[in-house]
């Protein structure tokens, strides 16, 4: 059942109005996102991040839960037991040389070491910025994920 490509793409996971609302609604809450295994590592990650939960965004959270359940059922078949982390919004600003270097999404904390699946949704319109490619390297083949606004990209966290 596990896909040979080791990723799944869902176009139109969020509409443009929802993407805009998330960007503007959380822009004032951004903090430095350069932590890697609890330490600042700007050579690996330079970004601004914030988090939101189901209370703050019930409709978006429900959509994410439904997407994860559907993709997992039809593509990955992981044994998922919970959503142990809030959703993260990240901003990689060109004037700050924003980036996130190659990494896996499994971390050292109790929660991060249990991660099985990562979901990225492109909130920005790709015509509004340069760069910003999400590259995956499943099975040793680099793949540029689609940058279409509202598109969800799923991949194993490990």
Where are the model-predicted features located?
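Fe(II)/2-oxoglutarate oxygenase catalytic core
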Residues: 1-152, 158
